[in-house]
């Protein structure tokens, strides 16, 4: 006759089930992340780090813990949430699985103290390693998308702001900057949050003009600064290494200084006179040609560029352009976006 479990043994079995479930959860989440590092990013280093963490967890997944598994009797198998039914983008898939891994490691850390305290210590350190992995991967994602982006929309105040931006995103836009120098902070915060959500849905980068605090408040992908704004070093200290920092430049000296200061991309212009930059003389296509030969980081020709003159900028060496009025004032932003991208995509990709 099999003796019933004592109360202590019953608690032990529950702990074993918790450890078993969370080891599975952590390993599964890491495998999902690893697959994107391997096939989506072609990044062997990040994929190898995921694999190392998975193998470390596997060492602790003993037959003793597996034997405690009771899937038919687990009420959690019936629990779900609408947000788990679909994901808006690769970014949301990755974020959800990083959360899954981090939460599982925290559970393992606490309950392992009742099983093997050495595992608890290891899980604590692994959780910090996963935080670092998340930061590095998201930063890599941002930089990779920045390099792939050809068209950059800088917004201007508009009653149709959200509709125009979404129309451009539908046309293939992958990089957006929110710029409004006249609105009060409450409106800026509201609009920035909505734009950031749109970019999240469409898998585009979201940059905030000038305001590092606003960029952090809405979890933007970065900030774009002017020559008279916050020093790059301070902005980097506040934003960290994984978010993007762009800088406007008007001549080769400013370009070289920006590269030396470690910005992620620059604006080159204004190529033509534009009401967006009142009082600034156009740099012309000469500066575009100089940038094409001398700039080692992503750069965007900007200032008065539209469907009528984009090919002049391309002929001068531009592979990426930033626009304002040509999309914000377009009757059909989706079609204009598609046309501009069709011209830019004829250029040979950078190696």
Swiss-Prot record:
InterPro entries cross-referenced by the UniProt entry: Aldolase_TIM (IPR013785), ThiamineP_synth_sf (IPR036206), ThiamineP_synth_TenI (IPR022998), ThiD2 (IPR041397), TMP_synthase (IPR034291), TMP_synthase_cyanobac_bac (IPR016229)
Cofactor: binding details: Binds 1 Mg(2+) ion per subunit.
GO CC field: cytoplasm
Residues that bind Mg(2+): 210, 229
Keywords: Magnesium, Metal-binding, Thiamine biosynthesis, Transferase
Cofactor: Mg(2+)
Gene Ontology terms, MF aspect: magnesium ion binding; thiamine-phosphate diphosphorylase activity
Disordered: annotated span: 65-85
Alphabetized Gene3D superfamilies for the sequence: Aldolase class I
Region of interest (Unknown), ranges: 1-129
Region spans: Thiamine-phosphate synthase: 130-351
GO biological process: thiamine biosynthetic process; thiamine diphosphate biosynthetic process
Family, similarity comment: Belongs to the thiamine-phosphate synthase family.
Role played: Condenses 4-methyl-5-(beta-hydroxyethyl)thiazole monophosphate (THZ-P) and 2-methyl-4-amino-5-hydroxymethyl pyrimidine pyrophosphate (HMP-PP) to form thiamine monophosphate (TMP).
Stated name of the protein: Thiamine-phosphate synthase
Taxonomic lineage from the root: Bacteria, Bacillati, Cyanobacteriota, Cyanophyceae, Nostocales
